[in-house]
C-alpha cells in the first residue's frame, strides 16, 4: 500500500518522489517493526487485543516508520505541478494522514492514559474500524480510481458523487466498530449501526462513480485487459463486502 501510494501520488502530481531518503528509511523502520511484532506475538508477548496484538514496544517503531514515510508523501503531494487533484489523490493522501493518527491515538489511550478492561477493547475496536474502513478502504479506492481513469483515458465520471462519497466514508467510517450485543453501553452499538448505514450510502456512491468510469474503457491493449479485469474484480469484491457489512450490523 505504501509503495503504490507513493507511485500514484507522484504520477498524478506529475512530479518525482520528494525526500525519498525519508521514505526509504521509514520503510526499513516499518518493516523492522512489523518483523519484531510478529516475533513478539509468536513468542507469547501479544497484548491480547484483537487489532493491536503486537507488543507495546513495537507500536512506537511502527509509528516512527510510517511518520517518516508520511513526510515524503506529504512533500510529494505539496510539490505537485498539477493544482487540480483527482479522487485517487484524495483517498491516498487521506489514508497517509489517517493511519499514524489512529495508531498513535490508540497507543496513547491504552498505554499512556491506561485504558483498561472494556475501555481498552472499545479503543481497540475503534482502531480496527478506522484501519479497515478508512485506511485500507481508501488505499483500495485510490488505486481503483487511478487505474480506471488511466485505462479509460478520462477523469472519473460524477466528480460530485465522488466528493460526497469521500466525506461520507471518512466521517462515518471513523466512528463505530462495536457489534450489537457487545458488553458496552447500548448507545455505542446503536451508534455503530447508524454509522454503518451512512457508510453504506457512501459505498454505493463511490461504486456508482467507479462503475460508470470503467464503463468507458472499452478499447484496451491486450497487455492492459488482465489488469483492468483485476480492477473490475476488486470493485465487485468491494461492493460485496459493503453489502455483507451493512446487513451484519443488524444481526445479534
Per-segment meaning from a language model:
Residues 1-83, 108-117, 173-200:
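Membrane-interface helix-loop-helix modules in multi-pass inner-membrane proteins
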Residues 1-2, 121-144, 152, 157-166, ...:
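Functional transmembrane alpha-helices
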Residues 8-13, 74-80, 146-152, 210-217:
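Structural signal for the C-terminal ends of transmembrane alpha-helices
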Residues 14-31, 84-96, 153-169, 222-235:
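Membrane-interfacial loop-to-transmembrane alpha-helix junctions, especially the N-terminal start
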Residues 28-33, 65, 95-103, 137, ...:
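Hydrophobic membrane-spanning alpha-helices of multi-pass integral membrane proteins
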Residues 87-109, 121, 125-127, 163, ...:
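Aromatic- and glycine-enriched pocket-lining scaffold segments that form the walls
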Residues 95-107, 130-136, 140-152, 172-184, ...:
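Catalytic cores of extracellular degradative/oxidative enzymes
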Residues 104-115, 247-251:
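Short, motif-level signal for alpha-helix interfacial/capping segments enriched in acidic residues
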